[in-house]
């Protein structure tokens, strides 16, 4: 009998039960072996896993458990001791690994629980971030709507368009049932329904501004929910409505524009507001959200700014229209003034010509009478007539000069002259009158005063004569002193600053008298044309009141200044003026040529047999001019028209006197035709002299452009015509008196 080293099963075998256990252990073993493989796979795929050793222990535990189940398959039947030993070893290892894993889990489980806590924290954080993102999206959406509404509002500067656009865009953006704007009335005591969303022309009814709901809204800058039944919220019929929509109201500031007065705008002596009311659709559960209220508040502020801009634009356009109307009126006034000035100048020109013609006869005949044998009484009368005529001629020249000064047509005629000689000539002219009144006159010229200067000699002499003449006229006793010096800085004329250079200097002339003096309050009137103060003179003193007015304008034209100083009535006065003069750079020889009318050679004085042609449309003037020439020994032929002059003139005539004040320009063109007539015999062409009553510079320039040889200003005396003939026959071109 063979011996078997086997172990019998512990209980009798049941074939069916054994099969189920066998199959179960097999699948348990397969599961235990597959779980570690899956864990190893996922751990390798995971980039971060903090419990790798625990996983190794857990895997070993599972593998050993699977091994015990697999070995247990051989224990259901008779098996050898080796199988039992293997089974025991596997269970011991499984027990060790299981205990180690259990001990390790004591430390791992709290960490695993904290992971869950972190997960919950992260979920809460994520939910909070989602809420914040929703708020940001809401704010962004609100901002987008605000920008869109602002763009629509700012796209125009018309007040009515702004308000209507605001209501339309708010109604579209917020899906409103109604939106309205209440504007304060002019008195500010009521609110008037001015604009609504659904009605183009709302019924204009008002509510008192002292309503509690209005005070509540005006008391805060936030949008306020109000009752749908409040007076300002009754915008649409409520019949048939189950539930009215929620209503909010917000104030719209009307910005104070201190520099503008806007029509149809409330008086803004105190802070004023308009009221904007917004209603959600009725019969709906919709409510106002915070971001919608914020949108309404921002839009209200934007509307306030846009309204202020529109108001400024309206006032600017109104001011522009007013300015355009004023400009049109000013332009019309300017044209009328220019027309009046032209009419005045034309009138003065005509009157000048018409008055100079009889004066020409008076002065000419008086000068002829002076050449005859007269008794002392007759000579005195003739001299009186001549002086009165010359005074009248001077007055006419003053009026014409003033007219040209005022319209800016008068210009200075600059030239080099002897300044010292000019002062001496002025004294020579004034001394006869001063001697009669027993008034001594002294002339003081500063040592550094230049002798030869560049300026308008005639106008400077006229200024000095006017001022010195006034000193003589209004002084009954005492003395008169004339001082000339180079101007230095003077603080008394605060608005006039002297800036001399190497090419010019400022001449100061002081005329001091011991006459009647001037009341200080009358000094500002002195330089007013046609003005004579009672303290200064009476009408018996003579004069037109133009002398100082013209002198002031001449001084201004010479870039100077003039003023008068007086301590009061009976204390005399001092007239002071500064004028700008150029410093002459000419040589001594050329300077000597600037000395006025000092003949260097004997002048012609015998004109016997000189054939002269006189053309003048005025019979009296023609006769007087002929008489002067005949008295000088000339053989005179007279004509009354241009055609007759052109037909009569011949090479026998040495001089032709022609009146250029005749109507039209033919009187100038006749000079050109005379030049053409003598083209082949230029040396036989007669000298052409213009007789003119116009003292302006344009007459002289026109005469030069038409080829005339000289100009003689009416009225003409015997000495004038003698000097002209002498100068022409030397020969040299003369433009006398211009």
From Swiss-Prot:
CDD domains tied to this protein: HisKA (cd00082), REC_ETR-like (cd19933)
Organism: Arabidopsis thaliana
Tissues of expression: Leaves, roots, stems, seedlings, flowers, anthers, carpels and ovules.
Underlying gene: ETR1
Description of its domains: The GAF domain is sufficient to mediate heteromerization.
Modification 4-aspartylphosphate occurs at: 659
Outcome of swapping residue 107 to A: No effect on ethylene binding
Domain GAF residues, every copy: 158-307
Disrupted gene: phenotype observed: No visible phenotype in ethylene response; due to redundancy with ERS1. Ers1 and etr1 double mutants display a constitutive ethylene-response phenotype.
Cofactor(s) listed in the protein's UniProt record: Cu cation
Signal peptide stretch: none
Protein name according to UniProt: Ethylene receptor 1
Binding-site list for ADP: 470-473, 513, 529, 544, 548
Alphabetically ordered keywords of this record: ATP-binding, Copper, Disulfide bond, Endoplasmic reticulum, Ethylene signaling pathway, Isopeptide bond, Kinase, Membrane, Metal-binding, Nucleotide-binding, Phosphoprotein, Receptor, Transferase, Transmembrane, Transmembrane helix, Two-component regulatory system, Ubl conjugation
Cellular component terms (Gene Ontology): endoplasmic reticulum; endoplasmic reticulum membrane
């Amino acid at each position: 009998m063979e011996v078997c080293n086997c172990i019998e099963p512990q209980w009798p075998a049941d074939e069916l039960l054994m099969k189920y256990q066998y199959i179960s252990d097999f699948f348990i073993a397969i599961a235990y072996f597959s779980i570690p493989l899956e864990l190893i796979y996922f751990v390798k795929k995971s980039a971060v896993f903090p419990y790798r050793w625990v996983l190794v222990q857990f895997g070993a535990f599972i593998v050993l458990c699977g091994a015990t189940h697999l070995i247990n398959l051989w224990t259901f039947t008779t098996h050898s001791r080796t199988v039992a030993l293997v089974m025991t070893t596997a269970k011991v290892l499984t027990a060790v690994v299981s205990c180690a894993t259990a001990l390790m889990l004591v430390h791992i489980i709290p960490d695993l629980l904290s992971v869950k806590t972190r997960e919950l924290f992260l979920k809460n954080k994520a939910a909070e971030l989602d809420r914040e993102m929703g708020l940001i999206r809401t704010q962004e959406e609100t901002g987008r709507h605000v920008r869109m509404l602002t763009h629509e509002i700012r796209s125009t500067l018309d007040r009515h368009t702004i308000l209507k656009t605001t209501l339309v865009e708010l109604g579209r953006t917020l899906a409103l049932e109604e939106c309205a704007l209440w504007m304060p009335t002019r008195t500010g005591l009521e609110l008037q329904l001015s604009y609504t969303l659904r009605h183009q022309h709302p019924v204009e009814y008002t509510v008192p501004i002292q309503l509690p709901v209005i005070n509540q809204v005006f008391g805060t800058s936030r949008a306020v929910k109000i009752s749908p039944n409040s007076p300002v919220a009754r915008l649409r019929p409520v019949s048939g409505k189950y539930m009215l929509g929620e209503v909010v109201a917000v104030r719209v500031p009307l910005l104070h524009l201190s520099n503008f007065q806007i029509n149809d705008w409330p008086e803004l002596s105190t802070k004023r507001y308009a009221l904007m009311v917004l209603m959600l659709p009725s019969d709906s559960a919709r409510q106002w959200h915070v971001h919608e209220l914020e949108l309404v508040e921002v839009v209200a502020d934007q509307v306030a700014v846009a309204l202020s801009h529109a108001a400024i634009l309206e006032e600017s356009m109104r001011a522009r229209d007013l300015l355009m109307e004023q400009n049109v009126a000013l332009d019309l006034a300017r044209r009328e003034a220019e027309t009046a000035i032209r009419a005045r100048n034309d009138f003065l020109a005509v009157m000048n010509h018409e008055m100079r013609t009889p004066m020409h006869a008076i002065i000419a005949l008086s000068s002829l009478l002076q050449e005859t044998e007269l008794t002392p009484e007759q000579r005195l009368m003739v001299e009186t007539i001549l002086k009165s005529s010359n005074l009248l001629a001077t007055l006419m020249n003053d009026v014409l000069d003033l007219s040209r000064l005022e319209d800016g047509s008068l210009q200075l005629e600059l030239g080099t002259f002897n300044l010292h000689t000019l002062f001496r000539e002025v004294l020579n002219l004034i001394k006869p009158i001063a001697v009669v009144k027993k008034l001594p006159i002294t002339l003081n010229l500063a040592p550094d005063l230049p002798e030869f200067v560049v300026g308008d000699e005639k106008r400077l002499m006229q200024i000095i004569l006017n001022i010195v003449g006034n000193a003589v006229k209004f002084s009954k006793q005492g003395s008169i002193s004339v001082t000339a010096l180079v101007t230095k800085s003077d603080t008394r004329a605060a608005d006039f600053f002297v800036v001399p250079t190497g090419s010019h200097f400022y001449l100061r002339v002081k005329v001091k008298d011991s006459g009647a003096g001037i009341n200080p309050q009358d000094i500002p009137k002195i330089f007013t044309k046609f003005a004579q103060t009672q303290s200064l003179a009476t009408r018996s003193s003579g004069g037109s009141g133009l002398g100082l007015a013209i002198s002031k304008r001449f001084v201004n034209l010479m870039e100077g200044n003039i003023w008068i100083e007086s301590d009061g009535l009976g204390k005399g006065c001092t007239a002071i003026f500064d004028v700008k003069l150029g410093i002459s750079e000419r040589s001594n020889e050329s300077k000597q040529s600037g000395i006025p009318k000092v003949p260097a050679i004997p002048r012609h004085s015998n004109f016997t047999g000189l054939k002269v042609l006189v053309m003048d449309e005025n019979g009296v003037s023609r006769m007087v001019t002929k008489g002067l020439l005949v008295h000088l020994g000339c053989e005179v032929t007279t004509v009354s028209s241009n055609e007759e002059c052109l037909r009569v003139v011949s090479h026998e005539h040495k001089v032709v006197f022609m009146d250029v004040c005749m109507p039209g320009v033919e009187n100038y063109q006749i000079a050109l035709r005379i030049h053409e007539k003598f083209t082949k015999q230029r040396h036989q062409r007669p000298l052409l002299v213009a007789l003119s009553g116009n003292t302006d510079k344009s007459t002289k320039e026109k005469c030069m452009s038409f080829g005339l040889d000289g100009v003689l200003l009416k009225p003409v005396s015997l000495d004038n015509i003698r000097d002209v003939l002498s100068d022409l026959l030397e020969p040299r071109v003369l433009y006398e008196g211009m």
